[in-house]
Amino acid sequence: MAATKRAACLIGWPAAHSRSPLIHHYWLRRLGIEGGYSIEAVPPEGFAEFVLHLKTHGYVGANVTIPHKERALQLTEPDERARAVGAANTLYYDGDLLRSTNTDIEGFIGNLDASAPGWDRSPHAVVLGAGGSSRAVVFGLLERGVQRIALANRSIERAQALRDLFGERVVPIAWSDIPAALPGAGLLVNTTSLGMKGQPPLQIDLSALPADAVVSDLVYVPLETDLLAAAKARGLRTADGLGMLLHQAVRGFDLWFGARPHVTAELRALVEADLAPK
């Protein structure tokens, strides 16, 4: 049960290792807002009842994480972004109506804007992976005006499904065709789990990328993946997964607490310290 002050929560199963409370409590302190942010471990069989009585639990809104993102879409009034991505990660009230959105799109684009200003000057991008994170990335790139997205996935059918969803600017390619797609691409994005701690590395020759290209990796454990290290070694600009995690939290905080926070170096250092091996 949340306190009577304005409060939000993260709903997941499991959710104990989330950094969301650290992020939101930092902003509450910095902005002098009386509020709270809790973790609610809710199993799938109890999710619908919990969400439908969110106000009764004392919350003005919530973040939603695995495995509830798709179900949250069905239980709320989703916006265009949540519908396009097929998942909701942020719930908020509009009067008594519970609405939902997906802030991964803003998180991805906001991180690029902060880490690599001018990244969108190139009309071409290459995106690796066709899962849920890829949907958010593709939506954001198209909305920003990218004209051609080469979408590589080991299962070409999943990439074709995203082309069917988002239109002809998305061009499905085989995984083996990635090297041929890199020349002229101003942005390379990894949305897969390759390179994550405990997963195989993502091994791609970046030599064909233009000298002013940007490389983004949604993985944030480790903070510097092999892909980002290779990009930096070539003098390319990079955007890591932690930046996206921080930027995606901004809109939810604004919706719940009525103030738009900033992603600062101090906040990043705080979360980096929490991520460091103990």
UniProtKB/Swiss-Prot annotation:
Official protein name in the record: Shikimate dehydrogenase (NADP(+))
Function in brief: Involved in the biosynthesis of the chorismate, which leads to the biosynthesis of aromatic amino acids. Catalyzes the reversible NADPH linked reduction of 3-dehydroshikimate (DHSA) to yield shikimate (SA).
Catalytic residues in the record: 69 (proton acceptor)
Positions with a binding annotation for NADP(+): 80, 129-133, 218, 241
Keywords: Amino-acid biosynthesis, Aromatic amino acid biosynthesis, NADP, Oxidoreductase
Enzyme Commission (EC) number: 1.1.1.25
Tree of life domain: Bacteria
Pathway: Metabolic intermediate biosynthesis; chorismate biosynthesis; chorismate from D-erythrose 4-phosphate and phosphoenolpyruvate: step 4/7
Annotated positions binding shikimate: 18-20, 65, 89, 104, 220
GO CC terms, sorted: cytosol
One example of a Gene Ontology biological process annotation: shikimate metabolic process
Signal peptide annotation: none
Species classification: Bacteria, Pseudomonadati, Pseudomonadota, Alphaproteobacteria, Hyphomicrobiales
Pfam families: SDH_C, Shikimate_DH, Shikimate_dh_N
Subunit structure: Homodimer.
Similarity comment text for this entry: Belongs to the shikimate dehydrogenase family.
Enzyme class: oxidoreductase
Alphabetized GO MF terms: NADP binding; shikimate 3-dehydrogenase (NADP+) activity
Catalytic activity: shikimate + NADP(+) = 3-dehydroshikimate + NADPH + H(+)
